[in-house]
């Protein structure tokens, strides 16, 4: 549900950013000032104080044992790869390609790009019903295919508005995969260990968000859009392979 709500907001953001970009390229950056009131409000939130003394040695030992498990490492790699597929070929390369290849204006690019968020919202909103019919493994593999297929032909799409289809599918991949991965990461340990585990997962997210735009920008400069999206396709294949081994098949209950 959280992914669906955030995706609903991000449907509007590219459109607003594109319209502001038509006015001035500096204007979209002023939107970040809206975060300042939120920062002030967060200082007013009262947090509960921990009960008793914290056994840090036991905490780090238990958390370290969880983080060294093969399944935990697989989840962190999967998180990194998913955000690499999002922030590299989609968030970074597509707006540049749309301007260079289709000579599209900022508002048109923003409107087309909003289909990523629409796909993510619809997939995340329908995830509870889908999970009732199919296992997490099946859904994450479907999400992996949705990451991979659009990147296979996005560079060869003849028109800007036709890009809405692969972008929508790419957004659906996010809506299917990220809630499932985040839920499984949170369940790796006990509630006492959850903060450290989620911190490592979030670090993997931020590293991917930082490295992927730079990496795919370099690839697009050297091998143009075909090279960038071929690299994104390879990332999608890696997502499928890691998900195949990390998520265990759902086993039917034994009959007595």
Labelled PLM ranges:
Residues 33-52, 242-247:
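C-terminal membrane-cytosol helix-exit motif in multi-pass small-molecule transporters
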Residues 138-152, 233:
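Structural signature of the two symmetry-related core transmembrane helices
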Residues 191-223:
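A late C-terminal transmembrane helix in Major Facilitator Superfamily
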Residues 123-135, 220:
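Helix-to-loop junctions at the C-terminal end of transmembrane segments
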Residues 47-76:
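Juxtamembrane intracellular "pre-TM" segments in multi-pass secondary transporters
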Residues 74-113:
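Extracytoplasmic gate region of multi-pass secondary transporters
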Residues 1-44:
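Helix-loop-helix hairpin linking two adjacent transmembrane segments in secondary transporters
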Residues 176-189:
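Intracellular juxtamembrane helix-capping segments at the cytosolic ends
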